[in-house]
Amino acid sequence: MAVYAVGDLQGCLQPLKCLLEQVAFDPAQDQLWLVGDLVNRGPQSLETLRFLYSIRHALTCVLGNHDLHLLAVAHNIERLKKGDTLREILDAPDRDDLLDWLRLQKLVHHDAERQITLVHAGIPPQWSLAKALKRAAEVEEVLRDDARLPLFLDGMYGNEPAKWNKDLHGVTRLRVITNYFTRMRFCTADGTLDLKSKEGVGSAPPGFAPWFSHPQRKMRGEKIIFGHWAALDGNCQEPGLYALDTGCVWGGAMTLLNVDSGALHRCTCPKQ
């Protein structure tokens, strides 16, 4: 059995299939891990979700910010934005099956056998693996709760609070957890977020740095696979960290990692 991890899909199905063909992926015996942002911006968001649903027995996904945005739009909490390519999903006859499956996915996945963690944006420097999994579980529980889900989706958007505090409660608490796992790029050593800067490492605001570069990061030395930050183009210069968002939807490439061997495969993508 081989385990492969792939960066942000964002509704780009053909590059994914190209990569799976390159490695002769067999869903009957192999496993596919995805770093989230499965949909949006690319031309095949519906077809991508349907394909993933068809191989869900061989799939491990974590949720990204675009996936959560889809859930918010589907629940009439948020409106479609310019550039969104989610309408086909919303109008699809099988939308409920697809969306119910989507909200069962995790924010953070840890493979104990391989000692490697999968997350969309990253793990804040002040959290250990145990704390990250515990905080992620708080949001995952709400996503699966029909009664609590709308309130969470309604309060999910926003950049404040910019820093975790154990005394936070309610949707405010869930928002900062979600922002860490699905939107983070730059932060301070104590986990204060800057969510406005989206360019490369050199664009860090004064006092901020990439989440993975803080010397006292609790998970330093542990393996993490993440996406979200296309401007890194796969290069974060940190041992054991694999940045897999290489900007497919922006005309870059889609990247696949053999989790066990470390081998990388790329498929170039047309700009959408």
Swiss-Prot record:
Disulfide bonds: none annotated. It catalyses: P(1),P(4)-bis(5'-adenosyl) tetraphosphate + H2O = 2 ADP + 2 H(+). Its EC number is 3.6.1.41. One of its GO terms (molecular function) is bis(5'-nucleosyl)-tetraphosphatase (symmetrical) activity. InterPro entries: ApaH, Calcineurin-like_PHP_ApaH, Metallo-depent_PP-like. Belongs to the Ap4A hydrolase family. This is Bis(5'-nucleosyl)-tetraphosphatase, symmetrical. It comes from Ectopseudomonas mendocina (strain ymp) (Pseudomonas mendocina).
